[in-house]
Amino acid sequence: MNNNYIPLNIDLLKDFLDEGLLESNIEIFVSQSTGSTNDDAKNFLSEQSSLLSIHASEQQIAGKGRNGKKWISPKGKNIYLSIGWLSNLKYSQLDGLSLAVGTILASSLNKFTQNQVGIKWPNDLLIEKKKISGIL
């Protein structure tokens, strides 16, 4: 890890969230290591404790991409984060959501980086042709 490394913590995440969102029914979790933030979000929402949850970790030991592909997740090297959202919508009504989320994320990240964040259809964000995110 480099000298500029800042460990994840809940307060750090809250600094980047909209105040209105923080006042809503949202739960935020940060861990040093987890199997998969996506699994954490699914498990949490199955308990229906909150309509919205954020799960972040310094490391994933069983991260997955599309079609069950392994997602390499070394400690402190990337942002491992899943957002869980409890919805009554059918999957067919969510068509295009990953592209919309990708567009918003790319636009937001471009404010913080000198390198252009791009979108690779259907669900990846890239910087300099290297994948930085997958949206599931």
Stretch-by-stretch model annotation:
Residues M1-K111, S133:
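N-terminal lobe of the biotin/lipoate ligase/transferase fold
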Residues V101, S107-L136:
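Acidic (Asp/Glu) carboxylate-rich active-site/surface patches
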